């Protein structure tokens, strides 16, 4: 395939684009933090509503954080591994089609370019050039026909660790007050304040990195966490009242 000319290289070097390229990592952090802040928070609030002691809430909360981190991390690993396996299967299938029905695949390249408004006299040289470079042809078909990018071979493990660590770090935040305040009914108030503040910060950061309105994202995230904890507290309080009546 041809190389970029000197004038094009000069223009590219003059203009360096700054795009955010860590989308997958941010997605994993969001998954881990959102569940890590919400689930242990709701559990601790629910147990507080059931009049459990701070030590019991702390023990149950840490157990949940450990189990949740393992479960979420494993889920992230399997999801990333499944994506990699899917890419490999499609890569083999596309390679087989290029080898067995090259004319049909070349016509598909022409069709793809035509959808971008490229005229026949303009895209046929491109098609013929790709046919001379099977590796580039295969890469073109994977990206533009199937919309698949080659996954990072370490992606599955990175996803698992990122989600699990994010879950642990965020899951311990709602439990911090129970480590220092022995009376659960007082600890839950501090837990609510600390966690809502953490949810606001997390929601703001999430909105900033995902291109949404940070303030709205912060309020939305905090509201969801507050509703989850209030529901858990209310249900536990109701169950405790009915059991001990």
From Swiss-Prot:
Segments in the Vacuolar topological domain: 50-55, 184-186, 236-245
Major subcellular location class: membrane
Cytoplasmic compartment residues: 1-28, 77-162, 208-214
Keyword annotations: Ion transport, Iron, Iron transport, Membrane, Metal-binding, Transmembrane, Transmembrane helix, Transport, Vacuole
Topology of the protein relative to the lipid bilayer: Multi-pass membrane protein
UniProt keyword Transmembrane present: yes
Catalytic activity: Fe(2+)(in) = Fe(2+)(out)
GO cellular component: vacuolar membrane
Regions that span the bilayer: 29-49, 56-76, 163-183, 187-207, 215-235
Localization (cell): Vacuole membrane
Residues involved in Fe cation 3 binding: 97, 105, 108
Domain of life (superkingdom): Eukaryota
Signal peptide residues on this chain, from the entry's feature table: none
Mutation effect (residue 236 to E): Found in purple petals of mutant line cornflowers; most likely decreases iron transport activity
Binding annotation for Fe cation 2: 94, 105, 108, 141
Sequence positions that bind Fe cation 1: 94, 97, 105, 108, 145
Gene Ontology terms, MF aspect: manganese ion transmembrane transporter activity; metal ion binding
Family matches, as CDD domains: CCC1
PANTHER family referenced in this protein's UniProt entry, alphabetically: FE(2+)/MN(2+) TRANSPORTER PCL1 (PTHR31851)
Main function: Vacuolar iron transporter involved in the transfer of iron ions from the cytosol to the vacuole for intracellular iron storage. Plays an essential role in the development of blue coloration in cornflower petals.
Family the UniProt entry places it in: Belongs to the CCC1 family.
Name listed for the protein in its UniProt record: Vacuolar iron transporter
Organism annotation: Centaurea cyanus
Phylogenetic classification of the source organism: Eukaryota, Viridiplantae, Streptophyta, Embryophyta, Tracheophyta
Gene: VIT
């Amino acid at each position: 395939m041809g190389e970029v000319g000197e004038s094009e290289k000069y223009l590219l070097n003059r203009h360096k684009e700054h795009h955010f390229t860590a989308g997958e990592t941010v997605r994993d952090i969001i998954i881990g933090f959102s569940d890590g802040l919400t689930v242990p928070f709701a559990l601790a609030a629910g147990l507080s509503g059931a009049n459990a002691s701070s030590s019991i809430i702390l023990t149950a909360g840490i157990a949940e954080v450990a189990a949740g981190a393992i479960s979420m991390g494993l889920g992230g690993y399997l999801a990333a591994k499944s994506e990699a396996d899917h890419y490999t299967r499609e890569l083999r299938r596309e390679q087989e089609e290029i080898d067995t029905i090259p004319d049909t695949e070349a016509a598909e390249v022409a069709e793809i370019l035509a959808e971008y408004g490229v005229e026949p006299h303009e895209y046929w040289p491109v098609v013929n050039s790709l046919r001379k470079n099977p590796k580039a042809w295969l890469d073109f078909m994977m990206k533009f026909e199937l919309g698949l990018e080659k996954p990072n071979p370490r992606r599955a493990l990175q996803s698992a660790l990122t989600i699990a660590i994010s879950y642990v770090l965020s899951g311990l935040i709602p439990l911090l007050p129970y480590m220092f305040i022995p009376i659960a009914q007082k600890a839950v108030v501090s837990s609510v304040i600390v966690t809502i503040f953490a949810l606001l910060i997390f929601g703001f950061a999430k909105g900033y990195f995902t291109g949404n309105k940070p303030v709205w994202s912060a309020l939305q995230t905090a509201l969801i966490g507050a509703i989850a904890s209030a529901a858990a507290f209310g249900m536990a309080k109701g169950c405790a009242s009915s059991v001990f009546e």
